[in-house]
């Protein structure tokens, strides 16, 4: 083996590691951009909202105006939660957090421990909307997120 062989091998290994790091970084950035910049919709879409350790995942959604969203809420916690979305008035009505069960109202659903529930909501106009759990101390603990409704592109 010549003296150049170990040097060449080190150079090849270094380049392979560099390419791997670049591909991983670019892929991560593209995945992040997809989640933050591309709106769901228009039309009808289904979004799964997971509840883990009294947190909503994802915490932020971008949705095109006019989109009807079917929220599948999956509660991985051993306690009750709720999923409420809508304008600030909806959240003011629920701020006391005394309702453990909700009637069939679009954008409002109660979720049993380790259970699943479905609600739908149509986002008619652009703006920022909140989703939250208003059961006692859940909101303060961090159980809320944001939905940004963006205008649909016109051709």
Go through the PLM ranges and name each one:
Residues 13-26:
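Hydrophobic membrane-insertion alpha-helices, especially the h-region
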Residues 38-69:
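N-terminal edge beta-strand
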Residues 23-30, 34, 55, 106-155:
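Extracellular/periplasmic metallocenter environments
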Residues 89-99, 155:
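Short aromatic-acidic-glycine turn motif
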Residues 4-16:
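N-terminal Sec-pathway targeting helices
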Residues 45, 67, 79, 107, ...:
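Residues that flank catalytic or metal-binding motifs in active/ligand-binding sites
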Residues 59-84, 117-125, 129, 149-151:
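Beta-strand cores of secreted/periplasmic/IMS beta-sandwich domains, seen most often
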Residues 81, 94, 138:
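Histidine-centered active-site/metal-ligand motif
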